[in-house]
A protein has these predicted regions:
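Conserved N-terminal beta1-alpha1 strand-loop-helix module at the mouth
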Residues: 1-166
Length: 166
């Protein structure tokens, strides 16, 4: 049996957006906690959003190369997931997973077959892998920024590796 399709809507910033996402039937919502993102949400607002969402939809807080104090602050809010969307090493992802006590999603930038080969290093460390397009040259923040990558590159991925596409 194939893994179920999971719909995650990221960039939620308000209670209205949260309610619309829940009503639309999404499985998970993401809140960006990265000041350079136009979708950045403060810790205080994330706390309110998580509290409102609890028991209705899974929540995920997106962090970029967080320090330990940021991880602890976010973990204390009780999200279902923390998504790491920066250049975190496998060792750092493992440490954050142990520290946070919540499920960890690791986003990996894909732009070449070599990028796909790095997925295996995170497969047993992160609870879920999210494959995203490599940021365009000159981008000042991570993520595909609305771009896609050549999905034919996924043919080089071990079929036993579960993943999500961004």
């Amino acid at each position: 049996m194939a893994d179920p399709l999971i719909i995650k809507i990221c960039g939620i910033k308000s209670l209205d957006m949260l309610e619309t996402t829940i009503a639309a039937g999404a499985d998970m919502v993401g809140f960006m906690h990265f000041p350079r993102s136009p979708r950045h949400v403060s810790i205080e607002d994330i706390a309110t959003l998580i509290s409102t969402a609890r028991g209705r939809i899974e929540t995920c807080v997106v962090l970029v190369n967080p320090d330990n104090s940021c991880v602890a602050e976010v973990a204390a809010l009780g999200p279902d997931w923390i998504q790491l969307h920066g250049p975190e090493s496998a060792h750092r992802v493992e440490a954050i997973r142990a520290e946070a006590g919540v499920e960890i999603m690791k986003a990996l930038p894909i732009g070449s077959a070599e990028d796909v080969s790095h997925v295996a290093a995170f497969a047993d460390i992160a609870d879920r892998i999210l494959l995203d397009a490599k940021p365009p040259k000159g981008a000042d923040r991570p993520g595909g920024l609305g771009e896609t990558f050549d999905w034919a590159l996924l043919e080089g991925l071990d079929p036993a590796t579960p993943f999500m596409l961004s």
